[in-house]
Amino acid sequence: KMCIRDSFYLMEISNKLDANLRHFHQLLRVNENFDVVYRVIQIGGRDACVYFVDGFAKDDTLLRILQGFTSLKPDAVPQTAHEFSKLFIPYGEVDLLTDDAEIAVQVLSGVPCLFVDGYSKCFAIDCRTYPARGVAEPDKDKVLRGSRDGFVETLVFNTALIRRRIRDPQMTIEVMQAGSKSHTDIALCYMEGRVDQDLLSTIKKRIERLHVDALTMNQESLAECIYPHKWFNPFPKFRFSERPDTAAASILEGNLVILVDNSPAAMILPSSIFDIVEEADDYYFPPLTGTYLRVSRMVISFLTLFLTPVWLLFMQNPDWIPSWLEFIRLSDEIHVALIFQLLILEFAIDGLRLAAVNTPSMLTTPLSVIAGIVLGEYSVKSGWFNSETMLYMAFVTVANYSQASYELGYALKFMRVFLLIITAFFNLWGFVLGTVLCFLALVFNKTIAGKSYIYPLIPFSFSELKKRLIRTRLPHADGQGEEDR
């Protein structure tokens, strides 16, 4: 509202329609904005005007409400705006507003606002609708079994998907706004009695203190504003998910879920590294299968960090290779130093990934052929790369997609590149030092709630670690287990 207040002198809402029209025509810049529409109508012998944004209002609902005014007689119009709203606007969401800035924001948000001569209040009739796509399964967070719906860019649809799964009055959804220009809606979803109240109050205060024009990049902009962590710490402090079932499960566990309008992803906090590597498939399969998937994902993520640095260390010290690992030796002559091969491939893979994102779908297959055959096979034949280097980097590239977090994938990539460089320069001592620094980066890292990022490893808790590694059975009713046995 600050930007609107700074732009115009705002007066009190008048009970004279002409004064309100002059004021809001200037405030909303009706003559310049073709999509801001106003209609002057008659209600019981009184002049009235409704403002709305073309494309946001439900035409049939708004038309039905306005048609109900045509048959009103002058003696049937009540003296107060409250009585008028109660008698003649049969719609669930109607607010009586007197603040000019709030009315302007409501109109630009898609809420039709009605002014009636003789009333010093505005009727904000929430019959808006936003252009939205279907709640299809997200491309990133796919599952082998489970629900196939996903969040969209419309906030009310996303909150409805969560509310559908948690039908409990303790489930709370608070709405706040951020951005002096955009007035972006932010929903805080949590279970009363389970959420960390200190964390909740901290997040609310930080959102209220935001002084930005707009949340241009939605969640990422909000994350940077409410938690400005150090630039050299690559590990994500928030878990992002486009799945309503994942968000609902996190809320029931006592976490705070933040939804931002115009974004199809939910922010889950606080999140440790064990929370980030979890996926919905762990719970859509029986405990044994879920445990296998979870442990496999953790082991593969571990290998993406250490596979190429350990291989580089062995290639620099071939005498250390045991007999049962002879197959990892290079079979061809080295024309380019291994460290340069690995670093070039690290950047080349990111280049191919960016190219794939920006390539039209009809050209995806030709691009794959060029990347796989020309850049792969012929780069080995020409002597640029050794086949073993291509093999290990291919494994790292594919394994990086074993977990769904882009942020964690890039954090592991930065650590891997750091390990490669320090190992190439300082050999064994460099590898040991780099490993220790990576471990310390995790140890001294904290979640947004101030707890250990790698709990229950540090501080160690065997029972909690067991829950993180092993997918246990869901609790059953008393006596049901004995009957089943």
Task: Say what each PLM segment does.
Residues R167, E208, R353, V380, ...:
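Short polybasic/polar patches that bind polyanions
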Residues I258, A265, S271-L419:
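Transmembrane alpha-helical segments that form the functional core of multipass membrane systems
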Residues K1, R5-V310, F314, W320, ...:
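Membrane-embedded alpha-helical signal segments
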Residues S387-T389, M393-R485:
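Hydrophobic alpha-helical transmembrane segments of membrane transport and translocation systems
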